[in-house]
């Protein structure tokens, strides 16, 4: 029996976490995209939301259908409170950053017994530099991002000393605390849109995504024959389901250096793609883009191939969706409960004809 803390599930298959991590960003991406899915599916609640700034209601689900777009959002808006949440020890982060700053300013920490000693030694060194300009001149780093990071640290320290009247130890700890908060927020610089590999998932239909079976599901046709399509699909990755919590301590140790592809992989492997095994039946894939690479949001996506109507979709909404699909020649199908299992299956009838007969029957009854 496999150790649940050492394994993970990716696209329905079990792997060792250590093997997946060893793939690196390139290896994982190649493995994920070597055999492209022909379709991916996105569940929509088909509900209205009031937008106070516009003083009107929006049905973003129907707008996605009309415009052929998908919306990328922050992970904090997802239904899993652990999603992309980073639990990073403040004490370890503080110790790592202190060690780095002591190294940058040639502070001897060989006799230091702990964090307090390092703070004191660094305080003495910065005090000897005099004012802020003197401390800035003491920086001898070539990496522009690293140099800028240290400059920001110094400006925060000296700002606290002058305007807040803090002591050296307080100012140093406060500056590193701000670095810690900035680092924790790094995952929010990415936006995510979620997809599944099947339109028949009970978990998705019964959740907020499918609005208790009252929403609909859009099937998108994956087309990698164009450069635009390949670029889009290559930014969609399978979720890594595991019971092992994410930890970005390794990445935080050199968070002031120019980021590398390995740094990006650690962010994806331990954060953006990591979810609990409890959610594996969502069969999730994620389109992940950094803020700076999103030209439009909602973003144009692959061609809509088919619409799946929820088993409990209200009559009025079902007519609306069906009529739209018929007008724009988009195939559609209603989902019903299988008589012999707990699976959702496609209805053999045409929703349009069923709804038409239902409407005619209702009109006849009213005319009696």
Positions of PLM-derived features:
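Partner-binding and oligomerization surfaces adjacent to conserved cores of proteins
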Residues: 2-368
């Amino acid at each position: 029996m496999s150790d649940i803390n050492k394994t993970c599930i990716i696209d329905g298959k079990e792997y060792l976490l250590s093997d997946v991590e060893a793939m690196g960003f390139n290896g994982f991406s190649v493995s994920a995209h070597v055999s492209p899915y022909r379709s991916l599916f996105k569940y929509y609640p088909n509900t209205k939301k009031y937008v106070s700034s516009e003083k009107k209601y929006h049905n973003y689900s129907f707008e996605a259908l009309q415009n052929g777009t998908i919306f990328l959002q922050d992970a904090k808006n997802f239904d899993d409170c652990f999603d992309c949440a980073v639990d990073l020890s403040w004490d370890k982060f503080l110790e790592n950053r202190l060690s780095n700053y002591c190294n940058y300013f040639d502070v001897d920490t060989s006799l230091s017994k702990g964090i307090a000693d390092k703070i004191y030694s660094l305080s003495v060194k910065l005090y000897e530099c005099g004012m802020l300009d003197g401390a800035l001149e003491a920086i001898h780093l070539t990496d522009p991002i690293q140099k800028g990071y240290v400059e920001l640290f110094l400006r925060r320290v000296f700002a606290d000393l002058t305007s807040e009247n803090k002591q050296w130890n307080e100012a140093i700890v406060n500056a590193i605390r701000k670095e810690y908060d900035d680092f924790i927020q790094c995952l929010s610089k990415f936006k995510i849109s979620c997809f599944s590999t099947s339109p028949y998932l009970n978990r998705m239909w019964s959740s907020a995504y499918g609005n208790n079976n009252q929403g609909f599901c859009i099937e998108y046709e994956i087309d990698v024959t164009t450069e635009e399509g390949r670029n889009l699909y290559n930014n969609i990755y399978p979720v890594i389901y595991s019971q092992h919590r994410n930890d970005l301590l390794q990445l935080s140790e050199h968070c002031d250096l120019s980021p590398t592809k390995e740094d990006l992989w650690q962010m994806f492997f331990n954060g953006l793609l990591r979810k609990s095994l409890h959610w594996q039946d969502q069969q999730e894939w994620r389109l992940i883009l950094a803020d700076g690479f999103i030209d439009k949001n909602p973003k144009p996506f692959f061609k809509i191939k088919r619409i799946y109507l929820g088993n409990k979709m209200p009559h009025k909404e079902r007519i609306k969706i069906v009529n739209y699909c018929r007008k724009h020649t988009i195939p559609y199908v209603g989902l019903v409960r299988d008589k012999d299992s707990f699976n959702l299956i496609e209805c053999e009838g045409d929703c349009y004809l069923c709804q038409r007969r239902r409407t005619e029957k209702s009109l006849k009854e009213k005319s009696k």
